From Swiss-Prot:
Keywords, comma-separated and alphabetical: Toxin
Cross-link (Cyclopeptide (Ala-Pro)): 11-17
Name this protein carries in UniProt: MSDIN-like toxin proprotein 7
Superkingdom, taxonomy of origin: Eukaryota
Lineage: Eukaryota, Fungi, Dikarya, Basidiomycota, Agaricomycotina
Length: 34
């Protein structure tokens, strides 16, 4: 799952402005806070 999340990371940053400093935790958990 980490690979998929890493690939969608830029998409999350664009679609989910709510994630900023939590990006690292997002990749670690593999879950979207949005």
């Amino acid at each position: 799952m980490s690979d998929i999340n890493a690939t969608r990371l830029p998409a999350w940053l664009t679609d989910c402005p709510c994630v900023g400093d939590d990006v690292n935790r997002l990749l670690t958990r593999g879950e979207s806070l949005c």
